[in-house]
């Protein structure tokens, strides 16, 4: 929920070239009033793998990866030209070598450390999985592939002290696990108790948010109970540990408030953000067969329960385990399709997700009907 916004926040907070804007960007916030010693101390390289252009062969992916990821390194040097002087790249066109050049220069000239941000690190590898292109996925994540080489450069930079942190966002820990020794220093924060509430809005935060919206865009607090019940039914219910707090989905709640404000306080006709709908291909790919998909959806749509093994609630797992039938509940949980009801059962968190699942259910039945 809001992964890219978090990346933007970190970029602005740690970028040394934005120190003059710290008060403007963060002055009225908690982190602005309680700054750490590290704010605005680093050189930022920000990657976004979601813009990766796909290809059906490894050479094409490698070229597209370099085309996309040389730019962020060049931008960092341009923004910090006061430190890089007359530095010029000698390996333009190769994202890993350009990053390595910058890190070597920074270390040898005792420059501030580099802070690397990678948004949607697994976007294009997940696309390979949903397209059933497992052989190409294996090529990308094994041996000396361009992706493993890239993360090896980052690992080396962290070890040598030229990189302060590499913070990645993504959907699944599968790719990170399958990279194995290429990047075996990653720490998965998703299920850490201190970070859970970053994944959504608490009840207290949502109440504050709603009261603000009502005051500014509606008739005032007289509608609080009405709207509160609506958003609890549709956007609440996410729990990321069995004993964790229930959270609102920040993305779809904000979608509702934006529509509510644009309609001058009228409840929008469409309560479901279309961006919430995970592609039906994920369901088909995950379950491997139509029968498996229907069995799984029956359990969720009809019973609203899918048993899971709490021991499987791990922060890392590989591709083989992700597609294991016994692991479906955890796989769906990581895809954001279900949430934890307790230590034994996953469930649909709210009416919005039930609506989405009903659409999946109907699509699969239609697929079956057409096949017959």
Q: Residue ranges of each PLM-predicted region?
A:
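Conserved P-loop NTPase "ATPase switch" module shared by AAA+ and STAND
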Residues: 110-140
């Amino acid at each position: 929920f809001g992964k890219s916004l978090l990346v933007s926040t970190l970029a602005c907070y740690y970028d040394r070239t934005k120190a003059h804007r710290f008060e403007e960007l963060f002055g009225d916030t908690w982190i602005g009033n309680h700054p750490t010693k590290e704010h605005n101390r680093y050189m930022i390289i920000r990657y976004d793998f979601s813009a990766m252009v796909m290809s059906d062969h490894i050479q094409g992916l490698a070229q597209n990866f370099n085309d996309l990821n040389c730019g962020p390194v060049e931008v960092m040097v341009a923004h910090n030209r006061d430190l890089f002087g007359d530095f010029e790249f000698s390996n333009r066109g190769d994202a890993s070598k350009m990053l390595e050049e910058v890190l070597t220069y920074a270390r040898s000239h005792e420059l501030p450390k580099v802070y690397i941000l990678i948004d949607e690190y697994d976007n294009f590898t997940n696309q390979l999985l949903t397209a059933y292109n497992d052989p190409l996925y294996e090529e990308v994540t094994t041996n000396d592939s361009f992706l493993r080489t890239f993360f090896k450069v980052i690992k080396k930079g962290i070890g040598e002290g030229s990189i302060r942190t590499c913070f990645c966002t993504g959907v699944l820990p599968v790719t990170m696990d399958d990279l194995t020794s290429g990047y075996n220093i990653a720490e998965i924060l998703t299920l850490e108790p201190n970070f859970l509430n970053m994944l959504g809005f608490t009840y207290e935060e949502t109440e504050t948010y709603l009261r603000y919206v009502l005051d500014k865009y509606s008739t005032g607090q007289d509608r609080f109970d009405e709207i509160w019940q609506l958003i609890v039914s549709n956007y609440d219910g996410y729990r990321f540990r069995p004993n964790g707090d229930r959270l609102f989905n920040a993305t779809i709640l904000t979608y509702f408030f934006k529509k509510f404000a644009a309609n001058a306080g009228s409840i929008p006709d469409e309560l479901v953000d279309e961006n919430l709908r995970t592609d039906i291909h994920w369901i088909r790919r995950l379950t491997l067969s139509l029968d498996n998909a229907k069995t799984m959806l029956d359990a969720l749509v009809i019973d609203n329960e899918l048993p899971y093994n709490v021991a499987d609630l791990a922060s890392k797992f590989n591709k083989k385990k992700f597609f294991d039938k016994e692991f479906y509940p955890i796989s769906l949980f990581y895809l954001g399709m279900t949430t934890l009801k307790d230590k034994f059962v996953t469930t649909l968190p709210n009416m919005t997700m039930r609506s989405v699942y009903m659409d999946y259910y109907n699509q699969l039945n239609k697929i079956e009907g057409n096949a017959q």
